């Protein structure tokens, strides 16, 4: 008898149908003790059409780790996709895609228009596993481009926040 293979949700998504930038609710899981964890797709650029260079993505990652934590109750983690088109956001509890999209927009606005190198946390050899691979300039330019397109609370229809 063949074993059922695990299903990876993001591999089931038709990446040709989505319209980035967007926030997409992926799933909520309930742990053994009733704890609820939600997973969101924060897609910043259109899949298979573009990818954020690693230095810029790395800097966005470090900076939104602080900015989203301040804006989303129950923030757990925000990790980049290997394809470099966005991030997975994990939170305790559930949040609307509109609320997450607003928090993301505010965070990207800060990076694009206000952030200085002092606002990028953990950029030393002691605090980062690849401290040489950061670019605030690249992060700012990509954030401006993403914001110009607008952040949607829906992956398939443009519902800008």
Swiss-Prot record:
Q: Name one GO molecular function term.
A: iron ion binding
What Enzyme Commission number(s) does the record list for this chain?
4.4.1.21
Cofactor field = Fe cation
Q: Supply the enzyme class, top level.
A: lyase
Q: What keywords were assigned to this record?
A: Autoinducer synthesis, Iron, Lyase, Metal-binding, Quorum sensing
Which note does the record give on the cofactor?
Binds 1 Fe cation per subunit.
Tell whether Amino-acid biosynthesis is among the UniProt keywords: no
Q: List the disulfide bonds.
A: none
Enumerate the Pfam families for this protein: LuxS (PF02664)
One GO biological process this protein is involved in is:
quorum sensing
Role according to the record = Involved in the synthesis of autoinducer 2 (AI-2) which is secreted by bacteria and is used to communicate both the cell density and the metabolic potential of the environment. The regulation of gene expression in response to changes in cell density is called quorum sensing. Catalyzes the transformation of S-ribosylhomocysteine (RHC) to homocysteine (HC) and 4,5-dihydroxy-2,3-pentadione (DPD).
What is its quaternary makeup?
Homodimer.
Query: What's the family?
Result: Belongs to the LuxS family.
Name of this chain's protein: S-ribosylhomocysteine lyase
